[in-house]
Amino acid sequence: MTMRLLSLLLAAFLLAALPARAEVAYPLTVTDSLGREVTVPAEPKAVLLGSGFNLVALSLIHPDPVSLLAGWAGDMKGDNPEIYARFREKFPAIEDVPIIGDGVTVSFEAALSLKADLAILANWQADSDLGRQAIDYLERTGVPVVVVDFNNDALDNTADTMRLLGRVLNREEQANAFADFYDARIARIRERVAAHPEPGPTVLMDAFPNPEKCCYAYGTGGLGAFIAITGSRNIAESLPPQGGLVSIEFIVAANPEVYIATASPGGTYSGFSVGPGVDPEEARETLARAVESPFLASLKAVQDGRVHGLWNFFNAVPLNVLAAEAFARWLRPDIFSDVDPDETLKEINDRFAAVPFDGAYWISLKAN
């Protein structure tokens, strides 16, 4: 037997010994994030994304998520052009994917013309009148609609939502691996806080700080839940879960021990710039300017240097595990000194991400 033949036989043996990727059987009926039963007739090949941010979720379980798209909304491209640019560098075909809406509205005519076999909507879209109309329209034209939720109760729902996407898109192995990874890191935070029940600091989370007016504070929902998981206390917990406007007097009276600002790259809605593609020094400098106003500068949080910033759109993507770890490190450094979101991001990039995520997604006024 020649060496070439022996090598071929050995290669064939090794390939046969590898476990086959588990295949999903279609038609497939699933329960989506709104509790709706949805039947998907066949493996989706032409997907409509009601929110462009859900491309991030697809990119964690599929090596070429853009190849799945029949059409998508332009909200990620518009709100976070830097993260869009990263996808365009890796997958130039994204430039040719038709836009079907802006994340708030959906063009029914465009959706119908694209001959999609699945639509994925975000929970906040499906909860609106326009979203319900879109679901009804798409389903009447034969396009099944699956609703996903990375926003409401994200700490409890994100892993299950990834598993849902994995089943629907025939990527269960990859989705389950990410969900297990996510669950393990959230469990570490919960377990350690349970072992240290003493209360953490008081916190203000200020969405898109604006020197012209004050202030939109996160409540206990969305990213606000990431305060509570650390055992810390949100000064805006009496507001509706989504948060709301608060006055200077309210903040000064509460005098929070920690201040966290949220924003987007380029300071789209405020002067503070943080998120994909942002240099850490730019993020730190713009955060420093955001707390220069006299009333913020007088707060205990600012006086003590406990000022931090975070990419606001963590509330739309399964990367929110990074926000949870950043909050743990910032708010309870005494029990989370070994938790490092930078290392977690590196592992996500190495193990899961079709497009690596880079930039200053979180920042502290004081460099480590």
Short names for language-model regions:
Residues 23, 153-167, 180, 268-368:
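Structured C-terminal subdomain patch of bacterial secreted/periplasmic proteins
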Residues 55-113, 118, 122-126:
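A short, structured surface patch at a secondary-structure boundary
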Residues 33-35, 97-107, 239-247:
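Short helix-initiation/N-cap motifs at beta->coil->alpha
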Residues 7-17:
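Bacterial N-terminal signal peptides
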Residues 216-242:
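Alpha-helical, coiled-coil/dimerization segments enriched in small aliphatic residues
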Residues 74-82, 123-133, 148-161, 197-224, ...:
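Extracytoplasmic ligand-binding site segments that recognize negatively charged/polar headgroups
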Residues 235-249, 255-279:
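Pocket-lining segment of extracytoplasmic ligand-binding domains
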Residues 18-57, 173-206, 336-368:
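Bacterial Sec-exported substrate-binding components of ABC uptake systems
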